Regions:
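Alpha-helical recognition segments enriched in aromatics with Gly/Pro capping
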Residues: 1-121
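Structural motif
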Residues: 73-82, 101-103, 136-144, 155-160
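Hydrophobic packing residues in well-ordered alpha-helices of helical domains and bundles
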Residues: 106, 126, 162-165
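Extended alpha-helical coiled-coil "stalk/arm" regions
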Residues: 119-132
Length: 173
């Protein structure tokens, strides 16, 4: 990995990421290799590792054959924005579960937000919500807190907030 990364990105790059199962020893060893070979202090400015996602309590893996693919959920008629909300309900660094029940909750949340979309909110109120949303996401991409903020603001949601939600999280309401 270090050879590929440094070949494509150079001796230092902003972010290296992967699953939490790769943090040690894989990423630590590849960073040590690159740092020794290139004589740099750090190969990446930041290391980001995502938690594992289980399906109904069992870690998803190719060997178990229990992988859930977003494109297959979409092809089955599930709303891509609801799929995102289901994943965003847990913090990216935490191990978390995925299930039909969690996806159904996300679909209900999305439907509630869409139903409550209103233009009756002042621009100042909407801007305040968007500013809070940005601050929450800037704090280690805290998507569970962001969703909580948006649940509280859903009745006050207008097009400004909807546009920010699409731009920041890729969720269309």
């Amino acid at each position: 990995c270090s050879a590929i990364a440094t070949n494509r990105l150079g001796g230092h790059f902003a972010i290296q990421g992967g699953g939490s199962d790769l943090a040690f020893p894989h990423h630590e060893f590849s960073a040590a290799h690159a740092e020794a070979a290139l004589e740099v202090d750090r190969m990446a400015g930041h290391y980001v590792h995502a938690g594992m996602i289980a399906l109904d309590g069992v870690k998803m893996s190719k060997s178990l054959g229990n992988l859930v693919f977003v494109h297959k959920l979409s092809e089955a008629g599930r709303d891509p924005s609801a799929i995102r909300l289901a994943v965003f309900a847990g913090h990216y660094r935490e191990d978390r579960d995925f299930s039909d029940a969690i996806l159904a909750e996300a679909e209900e949340r999305l439907a509630r937000w869409r139903e409550q979309l209103s233009e009756e909110v002042s621009e100042a109120e909407a801007t305040d919500v968007v500013d809070k949303l940005r601050a929450i996401l800037a704090d280690d991409l805290n998507t569970p807190e962001a969703l909580s903020l948006l649940d509280g603001a859903a009745g006050d949601c207008n097009q400004i907030i909807a546009t920010a939600l699409d731009g920041l999280l890729g969720v269309r309401i």
